[in-house]
Amino acid sequence: MFAFYFLTACTTLKGVFGVSPSYNGLGLTPQMGWDSWNTFACDVSEQLLLDTADRISDLGLKDMGYKYVILDDCWSSGRDSDGFLVADKHKFPNGMGHVADHLHNNSFLFGMYSSAGEYTCAGYPGSLGREEEDAQFFANNRVDYLKYDNCYNKGQFGTPDVSYHRYKAMSDALNKTGRPIFYSLCNWGQDLTFYWGSGIANSWRMSGDITAEFTRPDSRCPCDGDEYDCKYAGFHCSIMNILNKAAPMGQNAGVGGWNDLDNLEVGVGNLTDDEEKAHFSMWAMVKSPLIIGADVNHLKASSYSIYSQASVIAINQDPKGIPATRVWRYYVSDTDEYGQGEIQMWSGPLDNGDQVVALLNGGSVARPMNTTLEEIFFDSNLGSKELTSTWDIYDLWANRVDNSTASAILEQNKAATGILYNATEQSYKDGLSKNDTRLFGQKIGSLSPNAILNTTVPAHGIAFYRLRPSA
């Protein structure tokens, strides 16, 4: 087996392409919420959104931070005589303002969708050339979030400058309305979005669309490996495919602007529990948005307990906002049914001096894996405090809600008080500063200088740790 290293490139580019603060004051941590597309596609309605929001609230997920309810494509019936977008009255009989008001009255934020093209991806009216009237439509309907796609763009791509100005037109139009609207680019990473996205948007997709597969290759997602500048992003991209493309991009994201690895597939399709845990952990660690793609009215207990794992969410919502770095990657011989097999180690700094560490097993069998302080603190000099200190190891999945408790919550449609973390009452930032034990996992040991962190990681699974300085 052999390894790939990206530390030199990442360290060099950090000084050249730094990340600006939020251009509009939003997105200080990655957004969390729910989006209709992964499960429902065009089968959307007012009732679906309101029922979903009620369920998210009842299950305690809203108070964990999942506050954006995002209506994706297929909501429009065209334009009126003045050129303004019109909602489909059969799907949304009371109009979008009614949906927004219901969500706002229940402490949610409302997201909608359009495309920087003549049409949306499903063939509905797009916003290319109509940015100002469409931005005003969204503002008039009290929208808080816009997902802005890339279909039917009339060939206006091919260089970063061309794509930048096409997406900047909507950014300027949204700002002109005077309403704070989170701007989420969905241009699939085309034309190196991660270099220019932070100046005009709060997040940007960096790859083709995700599918509920961990490693399965698909000809519709033609680029693999670390092809971060894929000329045809495609769709049906596996979790590992997207993660590997994201590996070198962390230096271009941070507070106010995030690499978006696409919606979460936890609870969608037939991923194993270990695959869902690895998926959620890595999206959290690289500071991708945490957007639920599942039908929350039919969640299985194990998926619910993943979405509600506060110690993992706290990694994502860490106020320092630095995505983790892939320190090493090895291909392995025990490939899965698709011929895929690799192992990786990721590490990243956290706001309170802690460090997050992941050992990721993309192979087909459980295996012993290990790492050292020298690898974990790869940027530190020999003799530094990080390398000469002892660190307590906290397992971020050890205190996961068990399936019996999760099933009871789902059946009763009510999260029992005190079981889940409530970020409405106490933000993740405040909870971390106060050392709230629910956000740190369970201590399982310590790692001293020159020692080795050893563990066994399941196939398509992860070992996920927070390291804290010993008292």
Swiss-Prot record:
Record: active site: 149 (nucleophile), 209 (proton donor)
Signal peptide limits: 1-18
Protein family (similarity comment): Belongs to the glycosyl hydrolase 27 family.
Alphabetical list of Pfam families matching this protein: Melibiase_2, Melibiase_C
Gene3D superfamilies: Aldolase class I (3.20.20.70), Golgi alpha-mannosidase II (2.60.40.1180)
Quaternary state and interactors: Homotetramer.
Glycosylation positions in this chain: 105, 175, 270, 370, 403, 422, 435, 454
Gene Ontology cellular-component terms listed: extracellular region
Main location: secreted
Record-given protein name: Alpha-galactosidase 5
PANTHER family associated with the record: ALPHA-GALACTOSIDASE MEL1, ALPHA-GALACTOSIDASE/ALPHA-N-ACETYLGALACTOSAMINIDASE
Enzyme Commission number(s) of this protein: 3.2.1.22
Disulfide cross-links: 42-74, 121-151, 221-237, 223-230
Top-level taxonomic group: Eukaryota
Source organism of this protein record: Saccharomyces cerevisiae
Keywords: Disulfide bond, Glycoprotein, Glycosidase, Hydrolase, Secreted, Signal
Localization per record: Secreted
GO molecular function, one term: alpha-galactosidase activity
Residues holding substrate: 72-73, 147, 205, 251
Reactions accelerated catalytically: Hydrolysis of terminal, non-reducing alpha-D-galactose residues in alpha-D-galactosides, including galactose oligosaccharides, galactomannans and galactolipids
Enzyme class: hydrolase
One of the GO BP terms on file: melibiose catabolic process
